[in-house]
Amino acid sequence: MSFIRSALAAAAFVALSIGAVQTASAADPENTVILKLKDGDVALEIRPDLAPKHVAQIKKLVREGAYNGVAFHRVIPGFMAQTGDVKFGNMDKGFDAARVGTGGSNYPDLPAEFSKEPFVRGTVGMARSQNPNSANSQFFIMFDDGPFLNGQYTVVGKVVSGMDAVDKIKKGSEAENGAVKNPDKIIKATIEADTK
């Protein structure tokens, strides 16, 4: 009898776990970005409650197809993977290895929207220059916790599924600040609501 009870409990746990993953990625399809990577899909929950201007710009760029083909040009093991240079980072058209990481979109830079949301594994933050109001299209995904970024960079969301694919993104050279030769790319980015 205890074997049956244990088996039922295990089955219930698995069912609840699967349901939780599905719910997490579909909680708000309008604010879920799906990144198709070489090792699988990554679902990002983007948070207009934390950074409304940044989220609006990301969604606009996703819907325009601007992130499709864009390289993960700076990837530092144990820290983060950076992408989103839609001007110089497109691996399918106009990739500029010398300038990747310096570009943005044709839209204006955004004012900082710092929050108390911490930078932990899976957090998605906006990349910027030393000017806190210079974020535009580039973003990064944390491999590990980064408390030194808290309150210094805008958090736009988090990975809700597919972190295993993020972990497999080709890493760069630490000696070259994470610059990646022959980098991996975002094959395609979509808003989940647009795929239904």
Swiss-Prot record:
Task: Specify whether Phosphoprotein is a keyword of the entry.
Answer: no
Q: Which reaction does it catalyse?
A: [protein]-peptidylproline (omega=180) = [protein]-peptidylproline (omega=0)
Where in or outside the cell it occurs: the entry states:
Periplasm
CDD domains cross-referenced by the UniProt entry: cyclophilin
What UniProt keywords apply to this chain's record, in alphabetical order? Isomerase, Periplasm, Rotamase, Signal
In its UniProt record, a GO molecular function of this protein is: peptidyl-prolyl cis-trans isomerase activity
**What InterPro entries is this protein classified in?**
Cyclophilin-like_dom_sf, Cyclophilin-type_PPIase, Cyclophilin-type_PPIase_CS, Cyclophilin-type_PPIase_dom, Cyclophilin_A-like
- Report the GO terms under cellular component: periplasmic space
Which cysteines share a disulfide bond? none
Signal peptide coordinates:
1-26
The keyword Isomerase appears for this protein: yes
Might you give the EC number(s) for this enzyme? 5.2.1.8
Q: Specify the enzyme's EC class, one word.
A: isomerase
What GO terms in the biological process aspect are recorded for it?
protein folding
Main localization is periplasm
- What residue stretches are annotated with the PPIase cyclophilin-type domain? 29-194
Family to which this protein belongs: Belongs to the cyclophilin-type PPIase family.
Describe the task this protein carries out.
PPIases accelerate the folding of proteins. It catalyzes the cis-trans isomerization of proline imidic peptide bonds in oligopeptides.
Q: What is this protein called?
A: Probable peptidyl-prolyl cis-trans isomerase
Species in which this protein is naturally found: Brucella abortus (strain 2308)
